[in-house]
Amino acid sequence: MNHSIKVYRGEFLESTHAIHVAVVNVKGELQYSYGDPMRAVFPRSSMKPFQAVAVVETGAADAYQFEEKDLSLICASHSGEKFHRNGVASILGRIHLEEEDLQCGTHIPRDIESYNELIRNGGSLTPVYSNCSGKHSGMLTAVVHMNEDVQSYREITHPHQQRILHVIEHVCSFPKSEIDISVDGCGVPVHCLPLENIALGFARLATPFDWESSHTAEHLDKVRNAMMEHPEMVGGTDRFDTDLMRVFNKRLVAKAGAEGVQCIGDVETGLGIAIKVEDGNGRATSVAAMEVLKQLGIGDKHLYEKLAQYIEAPVLNARKDKIGRITADFDLVKRQEAVQS
């Protein structure tokens, strides 16, 4: 049985989470794995960097004077902190649209202080609080720039959603005819493809010019640099993606997805990592990711010390007392083709 991530209450094993891991180089060669690296996965928000590439490819980011922090924000699953909300509002202002044009829905933001402030002021939740509002503002920027229909931008038949599908097909080397499409939590199309191909996408995001010399590579490079330069826009305070990119200081690009997905690209080795927690529980993702990085020899103890809360995540009770821990217990398998290369 795959009991890769273990949850302890005191010293007693209470729960386990199975995981799947694919580690791929920029050529698409599987280097390491655990579980089923070909498991079909909805990567969810992990695809946001590639959705951002589709925006850049239209010329919209340049036309509307996107700074790096804007590019990073359209890759975000943000916490709804004030600087995130202000960033989305700034983008909407540049394209002369209103918050009501965002079709992402809304929810209580991860940043509870922002929510408490909203309640104290007698306000109500609006789309800008959605963790996907940055992505949607990016999509709308491309749609406005291309003079396309704004109301239908979420539909898979919309030209911009087809551009996104093409980017994913190209970067992940998986035919779009075989990509299953469903609807993400924020209402836009979400794409299902093998974990191995998702990892390939992140290898190419990390080192695009080792893959090919093209406009797509240039756009991947631009998006990756923006995320690493402004990791606070991608997640926020006390978020794994943000903290990982900040601590590794422009070596790693990282993006989580709902239902237990975590993806990472390493600029130095050119490796792409994709992780899926089988039961979809996100509490296992950072612990699994840090163990994968450790086994790959990416980083050192000084960096890991700064990320200790993600290596062995604490289990807290309602009083915020530490009453348990979440740990990793698995060994990556080195693939034969990697041994021979």
Per-range role (PLM):
Residues 205-341:
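Structured C-terminal helix/loop/strand segments within mature extracytoplasmic catalytic/sensor domains
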Residues 43-61:
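Active-site SXXK
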Residues 1, 67-174, 178:
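Active-site-adjacent helix/loop patches that line small-molecule binding or acyl-intermediate pockets
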Residues 10-13, 129, 251-255:
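Short Gly/Pro-enriched turn/cap motifs at secondary-structure boundaries
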Residues 1-38:
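Beta-lactamase-like hydrolase cores
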Residues 34-42, 74-78, 122-130, 182-189, ...:
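A short glycine/serine-rich beta->alpha loop
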Residues 57-64, 96-99, 146-152, 158-165, ...:
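Bacterial peptidoglycan biogenesis and beta-lactam-recognition machinery
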Residues 16-21, 137, 165, 259-262:
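Short glycine-rich loop/turn motifs
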